[in-house]
């Protein structure tokens, strides 16, 4: 049985609230007993028998709920065993892909970059507007911003109010579509950095305690759990107190997201582990949302209050337009 099937079955069972069913059933049956008990018509011992039956019904509901919980626990154990292979396969696949990045012939390298840029999360216009509104709620020129893999996403336009604005990706070709959205003057203000996929000291070029907002949209869908957790650790260091990480990832607590992993369209990153890791690091969960497809949006906040010593908006350091800094 596939892991996606195990998780789908577990999630379906979790939707059943046996305690709620038992509560309503007991109250309905109690109404029946009350009607019988308060009637002047009392043939034989039906009232006593019905009261005893009601107690038995409650016990049976408790037993049924316990059996269901036992089944869910057994499924959790089966998932824990099965997911070890998914973690390993995701890591191996990522390591193979990242070790080859930029090291093949020019045409193949260009094709790989284009494939990465063409990856899109499908969104309804309503979802796109909702996410834009949430991003815009964090925009303030007093604070710096970072976008990891800006790609072709329209969200880059929402972040121009952050000063300075850092853009990071694996190579210049991946940054070009985002940079080209702006005029020459603003392009020169962007802080561009190259960070190879094999880098272990991620985001080392970004100053600590500087970012008011970090956006990673449609990036962690293509990283295994250890890479994602490494980014969480380092982004936390880069955020100012009160700063926010807004991110999407392939939430494998959802069965259809696990199915993407089984088709090698994504990597295995369960939401329960991602959120537990974030909590351990020190993040506070601000907001989470998912649609009926593959998008899971998560906002994590570094504790503290945002403050700034800036007295007026200043220009970022001028950088060459065509070449990004390389670590």
Segments the model singles out, each with a brief description of its role:
Residues 215:
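A conserved beta-strand element that flanks and buttresses the S-adenosyl-L-methionine
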Residues 142, 210-212:
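Local beta-strand N-terminus motif with an aromatic residue
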Residues 229-241:
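A short glycine-rich, Lys/Arg-flanked "PGG" loop and its adjoining helix->strand segment in the class I
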Residues 219:
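Hydrophobic adenine-recognition pocket in adenosine-nucleotide-binding enzymes
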Residues 201-205, 211, 236:
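A generic structured-segment signal
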Residues 2-205, 223-229, 244-327:
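Class I (Rossmann-like) S-adenosyl-L-methionine-dependent methyltransferase catalytic domain
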